[in-house]
């Protein structure tokens, strides 16, 4: 892959939920021509409906998809990665870039399974990518270059923000931004339930909770101020907010959320596929 500013051919192996989201975004932003996209699914008839472009090549043969691609995006479950790498290994070389979004599969493991000096990257996108508000953490293996990282950043920027991290932090990323949307949905649902308890319709309560969460997050991102400082700007002496915060503190919300991220991160570490695995 001499020119790696944009993929000449892209293989998406496992174009299911997240794979399909990424593929649609790449096509929408013109990052790859539909005629140069090769995607695999388990059942072409059922999955075709989730992919808008009929110009892509859709099938079930991973090796065939990887053959003419210079960027190969693996979007299968962690336990399926080894089988996929074994299948496409004859088509891999140092001119192709392999990117895996599978949690807990190390670059060392993928390099070993790929053979040779194949450039490998790990990526951890999250589900808000479906509306272009995701965040993806990427890290590179020993054969990947800064140019490979820039190509990956260009691709994943299509679904939100992209950050480069050391691989040792990928488990923490998984626990925070990977699992985080589920934690936030629970918080959002609970806020809405509070509104319902106080007489609001469920539709209005959900809208208020969702927009409030969105707006608060945007303030943090755009001002760069610490959340604690921003919290204090809402909290007036002897006001409503401080009474609500007291309830949150008594309910140990803060420590519970911290422990949720830690536990999810530890689980990712337990699942880790390293170069020591067969």
Question: Where is each model-derived feature located?
Answer:
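Rossmann-like NAD(P)(H) cofactor-binding subdomain of soluble oxidoreductases
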Residues: 22, 44-45, 54, 62-138
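NAD(P)+-binding Rossmann beta1-loop-alpha1 motif at the extreme N-terminus of oxidoreductases
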Residues: 1-60, 64-68, 133, 196-197
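Short acidic capping loops at alpha-helix termini that bridge into adjacent secondary structure
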Residues: 33-36, 94-96, 119, 203
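Short pre-catalytic strand/loop immediately N-terminal to key active-site residues, enriched for Gly-Thr
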Residues: 121, 170-175, 227-232
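Internal alpha-helical scaffold of NAD(P)-dependent oxidoreductase catalytic cores
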Residues: 109-119, 135-172, 185-222, 267
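Small-residue helix-packing motif on alpha-helices
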Residues: 37, 65, 81, 201-208, ...
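NAD(P)-dependent Rossmann-like dehydrogenase/reductase catalytic/cofactor-binding core
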Residues: 2-6, 210-278
């Amino acid at each position: 892959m001499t020119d790696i500013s944009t993929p000449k051919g892209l293989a998406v192996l496992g174009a299911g939920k997240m794979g399909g989201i990424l593929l649609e975004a790449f096509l929408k932003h013109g990052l790859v021509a539909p005629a140069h996209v090769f995607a695999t699914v388990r059942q072409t008839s059922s999955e075709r409906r989730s992919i808008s472009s009929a110009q892509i090549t859709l099938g079930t043969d991973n090796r065939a998809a990887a053959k003419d691609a210079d960027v190969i995006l693996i979007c299968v479950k962690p336990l399926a990665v080894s089988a996929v790498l074994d299948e496409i290994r004859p088509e891999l070389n140092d001119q192709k870039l392999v990117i895996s979004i599978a949690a807990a599969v190390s670059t060392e493991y993928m390099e070993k399974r790929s053979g040779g000096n194949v450039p490998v990257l790990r990526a951890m996108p999250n589900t808000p990518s479906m509306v272009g508000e995701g965040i993806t953490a990427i890290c590179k293996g020993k054969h990947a270059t800064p140019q490979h990282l820039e190509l990956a950043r260009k691709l994943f920027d299509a679904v939100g923000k992209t950050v480069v991290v050391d691989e040792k932090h990928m488990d923490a990323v998984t626990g925070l931004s990977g699992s985080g949307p589920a934690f936030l949905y629970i918080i959002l649902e609970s806020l809405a339930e509070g509104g319902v308890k106080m007489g609001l319709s469920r539709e209005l309560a959900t809208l208020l909770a969702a927009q409030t969460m969105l707006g608060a997050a945007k303030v943090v991102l755009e001002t760069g101020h610490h959340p604690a400082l921003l919290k204090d700007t809402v909290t007036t002496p002897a006001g409503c907010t401080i009474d609500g915060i007291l309830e949150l503190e008594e309910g140990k919300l803060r420590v519970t959320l911290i422990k949720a991220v830690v536990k999810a991160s530890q689980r990712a570490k337990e699942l880790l596929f390293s170069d020591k695995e067969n």
